[in-house]
Amino acid sequence: MLFRSDPEGRPTVFDALPADMPRVVSIGRLDFNTEGLLLLTNDGALARHLELPATGWLRRYRVRAHGRVSQSDLDALPEGVTIEGVRYGGIEAAIDSVQAGNMWLTIGLREGKNREVRRILGSLALEVNRLIRVSYGPFQLMDLAPGTVEAVKRRVLADQLGPAAEQFGLTGPIDGYKARQAKLNPGARKGGDEE
């Protein structure tokens, strides 16, 4: 769960983070019944920037769904779809395999509206029973174990952001980056070089 604390007392993602980690926010969200890659940052402006569809970063999911649909049904999704008055942008979708009453699909989208994958596939009479985010832009889940935290190096993030990296203090000397981080997290521990 992505709340700092859950009203029902369930554990949250933030409960599992290392104690010495600075306060972070999620980039996007994962619904309660969704698993997989979650990016965290201590820079709220960076989080907002990366969540915007204009950034162009594709979020890719592996989906197990009950029901049947043809690839030709999925081939209409790149044009977008309107469900119950809500417009969803273009979606890439491919059937990976069919097993008993379930199908495995790979879905790619650039928006990230609440329950978007479940609603779109539901409109095709598919009931999602497992949803795993496998990538967010250039960052991939690959073999990262559940609950594992892995830092993204400053240089890697700057390369991925391209020209936008400058507005987040990622292109100048490391001292400028550290000053920006200290301003964002005044109580954070001082530590190693994030190069």
Label each residue range with its predicted role.
Residues 1-195:
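Basic, flexible Lys/Arg- and Gly-enriched helix-loop patches that mediate nucleic-acid binding at interfaces
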